[in-house]
UniProtKB/Swiss-Prot annotation:
Organism: Saccharomyces cerevisiae (strain ATCC 204508 / S288c)
Keyword Cell division among UniProt keywords: no
GO cellular component, one term: cytoplasm
Renumbered ranges of motif Cx9C motif 1: 39-49
Signal sequence region: none
Protein name (database record): Cytochrome oxidase assembly factor 4
Function: Involved in cytochrome c oxidase assembly or stability.
InterPro entries per record: CHCH, Coa4-like
Amino acid sequence: MSETGETSEYYKQALEEYKEVQEDEDPDVWDTRISKTGCYVENLALQLCHAETGDWRQCFNEMALFRKCWEKNGNRERVSTVDVDGTTSKDSEKKK
């Protein structure tokens, strides 16, 4: 049976590592940048899953958690990307 969401082993491991990072008096630049997105745990859970499985297809639950967090925290507005049709993510949001 596949674990989902915040009960996945990767999420639990990422949460423990995040607690350690928060206690670090001198976090590295990467940890700081990811923390500012509000999705540090979800990002790390996705990375841990891929590192262990070597297959993104086995990380759909972690990917869904990360995407949900990313959108919930307004990170699409932080990063402008170009979609296949040539519009930016900001253009897509204006159409909604």
